Curated annotation (Swiss-Prot):
The keyword Translocase is annotated on this UniProt entry: no
NCBIfam families to which the protein is assigned, alphabetical: L6_bact
PROSITE patterns membership: RIBOSOMAL_L6_1
UniProt protein name: Large ribosomal subunit protein uL6
Subunit structure: Part of the 50S ribosomal subunit.
InterPro entries: Ribosomal_uL6-like (IPR000702), Ribosomal_uL6-like_a/b-dom_sf (IPR036789), Ribosomal_uL6_a/b-dom (IPR020040), Ribosomal_uL6_bac-type (IPR019906), Ribosomal_uL6_CS (IPR002358)
PANTHER family: 60S/50S RIBOSOMAL PROTEIN L6/L9, LARGE RIBOSOMAL SUBUNIT PROTEIN UL6M
Classification via Gene3D superfamilies: Ribosomal protein L6, alpha-beta domain
Record GO biological process: cytoplasmic translation
Signal peptide (residue range): none
Assigned GO CC terms: cytosolic large ribosomal subunit
Taxonomy of the source species: Bacteria, Pseudomonadati, Pseudomonadota, Alphaproteobacteria, Rhodobacterales
Entry keyword set: Ribonucleoprotein, Ribosomal protein, RNA-binding, rRNA-binding
Functional summary from the UniProt entry: This protein binds to the 23S rRNA, and is important in its secondary structure. It is located near the subunit interface in the base of the L7/L12 stalk, and near the tRNA binding site of the peptidyltransferase center.
Length: 177
């Protein structure tokens, strides 16, 4: 059984947290983010340390304890450092570029793919074959990266498509005569 909930979340300098009911609000140099925990846990802020305690001994309370601790830890990381996902594009003629708030992708389809970037996330293209997604919400950054990758997942024969930076694609051998 994981005991991640027992670990308190320490607040770095320049970050403040306040609890009102089941909602915790964390303010940092990059943003202000909040999280509402379930009634199975209690949240406390004392001496720049956030502690999460389960309200009972039930299985659900223990599950929410670990999950809430991880979510609060991600809030603190997001408002201090932020989160970043990098995508690589491989394939002849495959390219990406930002135009305003729209990511334009040429992926070998008969049309250009236009992806509207949601608020709270910044997308940049340092090269035409690289996409960098940054933001303070880990879930939103990962979801945007997954949505972009879904347009052309890497195929196993030539490796063409959009992949996460450093992702290993299992390559298959073609048909033999």
């Amino acid at each position: 059984m994981s005991r991640i909930g027992k670990k308190p979340v320490e607040l770095p300098t320049g970050v403040t947290a306040s609890v009102s009911g089941q909602t915790i609000e964390v303010k940092g140099p990059k943003a202000t983010r909040s999280f509402t925990a379930t009634d199975d846990v209690t949240l406390k802020v004392e001496d720049n340390v956030i502690t999460i305690e389960p309200r009972g001994k039930s299985k659900r309370a223990r599950q929410q304890w670990g999950m809430s601790r991880t979510m609060v830890g991600n809030l603190v990381t997001g408002v201090t450092n932020g989160f970043k996902k990098e995508l690589e594009i491989q394939g002849v003629g495959y390219r990406a570029q930002m135009q305003g708030n729209t990511l334009k992708l040429n992926l070998g389809l008969s049309h250009e793919v236009n992806y509207e970037v949601p608020a709270g996330v910044t997308v940049t293209c340092p090269k035409v074959t690289e996409i960098v997604i940054e933001g303070t919400d880990e879930q939103l950054v990962g979801q945007v990266a997954a949505n972009i990758r879904d347009w052309r997942k890497p195929e196993p024969y030539k490796g063409k498509g959009i992949r996460y930076k450093g992702e290993f694609i299992f390559r298959k051998e073609g048909k033999k005569k």
